[in-house]
Amino acid sequence: MNVSERLAASAVVPVIVLDDAKDAVATARALLAGGVDVMEITFRTAAAEDSIRAVAEECGEMVVGAGTVVTLEQCRRAVDAGAQFIVSPGYDDEVVAWCVEHDVTIVPGCVTPTEIMAAMKRGLSVLKFFPAGVYGGL
């Protein structure tokens, strides 16, 4: 299965915030022990890049992605660290184009018809309804 298929097959994609990269592998192993083989590590802390790298190197069966990616530089750093997919809170055409060009699964946050159409134009079929709460979601 490719990354998109693994994401689709997963009942849940835990969004993980790690303040210390030393906790990354233990967190990934706990998820794997519980039957979860996909995780998104947010780029909201300084430990994100090292956390992704540690999981990618130590837990090969885990599909690890980077979340809260808002710049192309973060995207590149995440992929270089071993992220297999990227999640962003909004649609950034530069990030999306780079991911498409480099065959990296990208899940941008989209809520407006304009954002959804831009994503479809880039060939994306999986989007994140975000921010859901603002638009009546849970």
Stretches with model-predicted labels:
Residues M1-Q84, E101:
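Conserved N-terminal beta1-alpha1 strand-loop-helix module at the mouth
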Residues A47, V70-E73, V79-L138:
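Conserved anion-binding
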